[in-house]
């Protein structure tokens, strides 16, 4: 799927430095990673590495831990 077709480049941008924090998704989020490297570990699940140019979706209700290995910038969209 082409990124411009789903409007990725019109989505807001979020940035975060190297860090580790818990997160819970109250609603579905789709994001496109512009820069950085992240390991997202769902509570009770296996870690998933997310890197530059990955398009990922997180379901509503997901509880996880974000471990940002290198500063991240991403486009994101809720719903």
What are these language model-derived features?
Residues 5, 10-13, 73-79:
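Double-stranded beta-helix
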Residues 44-61:
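Short acidic-glycine-tyrosine-enriched beta hairpin
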Residues 21-25, 42, 48-49, 67:
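Short histidine-centered beta-strand/loop micro-motifs
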Residues 60-79:
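Ligand-binding loop in jelly-roll beta-barrel domains
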Residues 23, 40, 74-77:
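Short hydrophobic/aromatic-rich beta-strand segments that constitute the beta-sheet cores
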Residues 7-26, 59-61:
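Conserved short histidine dyad/triad with adjacent acidic residue
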Residues 25-40:
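Short, conserved beta-strand element in jelly-roll/cupin
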